[in-house]
Amino acid sequence: MFGRLLLLGILFHVVFLKSIFDIYFVTPLIHGMKQYSAGEAPAKRLFLIVGDGLRPDKLLQPHSEKVIGEEQTYAAPFLRSIIQNNGTFGVSHTRVPTESRPGHVALIAGFYEDVSAVTKGWKKNPVNFDSVFNQSRHTYSFGSEDILPMFSEGASDPSRVDTFMYSSELEDFSSNGIVLDEWVFDRLDELLAQSLEDKELWDMLHRDKIVFFLHLLGIDTIGHNKHPDSVEYVENIQYIDGKIQELVDKMNNYYNNDGASSWVFTADHGMSDFGSHGDGNLDNTRTPIIAWGAGIQSPTHEKNYGHDEYSLPWNLTEIKRIDIQQADIAALMSYLVGLNFPVNSVGQIPLDYLDCSSRRKAEVALMNALEIGEQYNLKSASKDQTSIFFRPYSPLRNYTEVQASFYNSVIADIESGEYEIAIEHCFHFSQTVLSGLRYLQRYDWLLLRSIVFFGYLSWIGYVICFVFSLNIEPSSKIVKPVSVVKRVAFNIPFLLICIFFYIQSSPPFYYGYALFPTIFLQLIHSIFPNTKLGFKNFLTVAKQKHGFSLLKILFISLCILCLLQFIVYSYFHREGFSVILMGLAAWPWLLHADYAFSHKTISVSWSVLTSLLCFFTILPVNKKESLLFIFAGGFAMSVAGVFYILYRRNQAFQYSSTVTNKQLVLQVLIIMATVPVTLKIADSLQRNIAIPPILRLVAFGLFITSYIIPSHHIRSCKHYFLDRLAILFLTFSPTMCMLSISFEALFYVVLFITLGLWMELETELQKYTEQLHPEYSRKKDAKFHLSLSHIRISLFFYIFINVAFFGTGNVASLSTFALDSVKRFIPVFNPVTQGALLMYTILVPFIALSAAFGIMNKRLGGIQQVTFFLAVGMADIVTINFFYLVKDEGSWKDIGVSISHFCISNFLILFITALEHASAILCKNITYTIHEKVN
């Protein structure tokens, strides 16, 4: 019975996970659009130079002598001279996620890649949309193998894009990132030298519509390792600045100063002060944009124009700062070398960057607007063919007529010399089209969101009904078959919706969204008589044990709903969990005062530990590596281990357990050895000192040994439950110490002890209650009685699941993880292995939770499956909130976080299932009784 419900629940959540992508993030990609070109090109060739992970403030601000030396004030004097004398500059604003793939897609393809594209892979990421490289005559790209294949393999003609890539082994976080950039510049030099002997290559390099792409990863590598405020980060900027100056001189000589080269220098994303990126932190979303050469406007001297507090320290306020959106750069590059705009581009060409007449700017703006409008035209026509009673976007109701009117109006303005008016019309038309595209993406929202909401509601209703249906005598169970008429009545709405979806050629998943509510309603109907009987029994027990009436039960239910809503708030403001933990600290004193005052030791200990947990959820989520915190965590682990060994020496349960003090001492010694090794490696990395291979070997040895020792002794053993918890705590302690960068190890210690205390408190509280109400004692009555304590345990379990995650960070900090810990083991860039280590660190507290929860449920009489489904039901109440809180506009940090919140909450059933199975494994061969030593 439980197995079928679990399987149905997992299938439901897997299917409904896709709902947010079908509703909120319909791919913007369409094909078959007419292409538009900006016309005559001011340049024959374009140099796109991307400083991966470069922040504009670190590039342009003055630096102290300590950082940059006595001879210089600025890290990039050449690029500053370009800004002051030759080109145009500003800040390019990126979108979340601030990672290399979406950043480069926006730069080179002109649109912000849709979320569904994350399934296309991590390494090569082949893209299936148009790009500047695809429109070029030929592109020569140099850099990382994680970026370049995206555009070569996605090109309509792959031979059009040449890639020169170094291997991932060169991306060593413990070495100097300049090596990566040096490799790029050297390969370009080799290409130029080769052209002197290769006529075909020479001829190609001297043709028009040529693009050179230099991906410089050194700054990103150094930023992750040393952080942006380090000397090494600034040194890498200095190196790039010098090499760009050399490259400009080389290219001028190579092309005989023909003045046909355009240069664009920018970044795919920035970097936080903690050496991470990924979220919407302004340090991550702001990147530099400096353009110069053919077709680029010389600097405009207009004091304070575009400047704010962010750019005042750069001492460039006399130069006009022109900010753009990252996708606008693709349109700019297309204009510079006379390419067709990428057909999926939504970027609007930044006219202030162009060195041309007002008439030419108006003509370029017109072509840009028509290119964006073509996307709406094709998408609207496609929607019209598959929708019943299609309602087009009102301002574009008849697109052909609207476009013709717009085109004629702009041409008339241009011919009459009203260029500014023409440009304004183009901008307004583009904005209208973008609004129309958004309208089409939201076209089916109301219907789909209603179906999904009803799906979750019916699932929660079925879970509640199922739990109450268990609260009856087996002999009282009512088996009532559902009549054919009722089955047909239940399925009629589903059939009507299916017909509607079929006519509209809807995706297969749409049918699944409609199917599940139908199934759940039929299941609810079939068990409802037993549910009513079980609920009556529940009310009877609640009244006899606690004196609670139906009204009080409803009030408690309302309080639980309010608490779940507060958990939703706490996902966005994690300090909310501190408030919840303070409530848990006061719980025994407020609701079980008689027990708390008669068992002060355990009650006070509980309040102290849950209060300590409060501090972790108010500490900063973005952490810098702290040797002091790492030492404190390791010291606390060692003290806890020693304390337990001393404690068990005087306890009778040591004779019931096969665990020896020798084994526990050995595990504690491993922790003690781990602490200095971790501190030495971390200190060496901070000071940029080479780590001896023997030290890394010792670290790996300690890491592996910490698992070998307990696994060697755990087989065929009978452990007393406290011994099993101690072994698990000591087993994972070295891992948490080695992979901690701040207070993670301390959090692990406090959480583990708190969970152990929760287990003991619930067990003792049940014994106390059974003494007061012996008629419900498990010894006298083997029947299952659903009570308020089961609901409380489920609620606490769900709270601790969230605390285990939010205790050391939040969703945004997870997406911007710092590599300080994993590079102690793996200095070479390897996203899969490094990501696995980081995820393992996050999962360790949940392993502790599963062990404590499993042991507690065994001691309470095997209630795990009931508490499991109650926790799932609570989680899905939160999931409904997150479903409606998913954002597809506004702050791009909020968009990414809202998606993550829904996915995490929706998949809690899988996670809780994994915890349940983990607890079954972790709780094998455990004894719960004490046998005295026989003399």
From Swiss-Prot:
Primary subcellular site in the record, as a coarse category: endoplasmic reticulum
Protein localization: Endoplasmic reticulum membrane
Glycosylation sites: N86, N134, N315, N398, N925
Keyword Endoplasmic reticulum: yes
InterPro entries in alphabetical order: Alkaline_phosphatase_core_sf, GPI_EtnP_transferase_1, GPI_EtnP_transferase_1_C, Phosphodiest/P_Trfase, PIGN_N
EC number: 2.-.-.-
Lumenal-facing ranges: 27-449, 504-509, 569-576, 622-626, 685-688, 759-792, 857-865, 916-935
Transmembrane spans: 6-26, 450-470, 484-503, 510-530, 548-568, 577-597, 601-621, 627-647, 664-684, 689-709, 738-758, 793-813, 836-856, 866-886, 895-915
SUPFAM superfamilies: Alkaline phosphatase-like
Pathway entry: Glycolipid biosynthesis; glycosylphosphatidylinositol-anchor biosynthesis
Alphabetized UniProt keyword annotations: Cell wall biogenesis/degradation, Endoplasmic reticulum, Glycoprotein, GPI-anchor biosynthesis, Membrane, Transferase, Transmembrane, Transmembrane helix
GO molecular function: mannose-ethanolamine phosphotransferase activity
GO CC entries: endoplasmic reticulum membrane
Keyword Lipid metabolism: no
GO biological process, one term: GPI anchor biosynthetic process
Cytoplasmic-side positions: 1-5, 471-483, 531-547, 598-600, 648-663, 710-737, 814-835, 887-894
Bilayer disposition of the protein: Multi-pass membrane protein
Function: Ethanolamine phosphate transferase involved in glycosylphosphatidylinositol-anchor biosynthesis. Transfers ethanolamine phosphate to the first alpha-1,4-linked mannose of the glycosylphosphatidylinositol precursor of GPI-anchor.
Other remarks on this protein: Target of the inhibitor of GPI biosynthesis YW3548/BE49385A.
PANTHER family linked to this entry: GPI ETHANOLAMINE PHOSPHATE TRANSFERASE 1, PHOSPHATIDYLINOSITOL GLYCAN, CLASS N
Family statement: Belongs to the PIGG/PIGN/PIGO family. PIGN subfamily.
Name of this protein: GPI ethanolamine phosphate transferase 1
Lineage: Eukaryota, Fungi, Dikarya, Ascomycota, Taphrinomycotina
